[in-house]
Amino acid sequence: MENQGWELYISTRPIFKIGKFSAVLRANFAQNINSINSMDANVLNSMNTDFNYNGGNMQILKRCQIGNALGGIYGFHFKGVYVYDYDHNGYFDPRTGKNDYYDAAGVENTAAHALAAGYEGVNIYNAAPVARDAEGKVIYDKNGNPLPMVYDYGGTNYQFGGGDVAYEDINHDGQINELDIQYLGSSSPKFNGGFGVDLTYGRWTLKTNFNFRVGNKIINLARMNSEAMRDNKNQSAAVNWRWRKNGQVTEIPRALSTQIAASYNALVSDRYVEKGDYLRFQYLQLGYSLDPKKLKKAGFSTVRFTASINNLFVWSKYTGADPDHSQSKYDPCVDNDTTPRSRSFTAGVVVGF
């Protein structure tokens, strides 16, 4: 394993000074690059968990892979939600026995035709749950019917339908299984650091500090649970936009009547992997020092009053409550509805003799 990095700290003299007023800037930046270059095969196997998704455990894989960093995230690639079910996919017309573009009622299915043909701007891979080759062409079975997409693991052979999640079939065999798992990013940030400014006017001071993190990924397990529609847990308002009928284009899969069937729409994928970039306004502190000449007569050298507001704001595109999460050992960073940092107010007095 190899670690490379650097850290830079900057603190300026007053960048400007006008009478009693002055300002000082400070900043620190750091980068740490981690990679696994080689590892004993037995040790590597002992650290990696096998793919064992039985339709109910919503398993998060813990893996170390040569060439990637510790804290890597592994799962399936989310391609969207199937717009049409298999029987409504517009490929087969039972009246003619040909692969024409008609729906079950015999009406020309122009939407399915467009999706199947791969018109510009349309994702053909989530049109209907049928297998496609590397060129995006439909794969047919020996009877001339489109090969259906299935989740195939152990004794499970679940056939995906309209409204189910479309996962990337890497090897184009029509089966979603452990062979389709891929590297989805690292929980380690590419950069992190902080900066602030200290303003002084006479005996008054105003200090600020910001910290940031860039380039890390988080598994939003809280969102996974609140959008899974698989048990009696409270659900997010996002499920109101779930798939309900053929032809509906949405990013939220359908609701299913059984927990196991619903779980295949909640496999760990980059649907739930989010950027953890953030900028936090860490604190704002106002301070005032009493006149040292007057304090000396009373036997004091220093008396200083401070008042601070901590954790004022966080700017982030992360959809969870707080993007500031840490990883442990080689595990990926997971947000399982962790209580976010609270905003606090503090006051203090520093007395010197």
Name the predicted role of every residue range.
Residues D100, E108, V122-N126, R132-Y140, ...:
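Extracytoplasmic gating/loop element in the C-terminal half of outer-membrane beta-barrel translocons
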Residues T12-P14, F29-S35, Y201-R203, F212-N216, ...:
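Transmembrane beta-strands of outer-membrane beta-barrel pores
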Residues W6, K17-I18, R203-T208, K293-K294:
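Repeated loop/turn-to-beta-strand initiation elements of outer-membrane beta-barrel proteins
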Residues M1-N3, F51-N89, D93-T96, R242-Q248, ...:
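C-terminal beta-signal and terminal closure region of outer-membrane beta-barrel proteins
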Residues A23-L25, F195, Y201, L206-T208, ...:
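Transmembrane beta-strands of outer-membrane beta-barrel proteins
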Residues K20, N34-G56, G215-W241, W315-D324:
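Outer-membrane beta-barrel and related beta-rich outer-membrane complex signature
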Residues N3-E7, S22, K190-G194, Y278-Q285, ...:
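Transmembrane beta-barrel architecture of outer-membrane proteins
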Residues W6, F16-Y183, N310:
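Conserved small-residue
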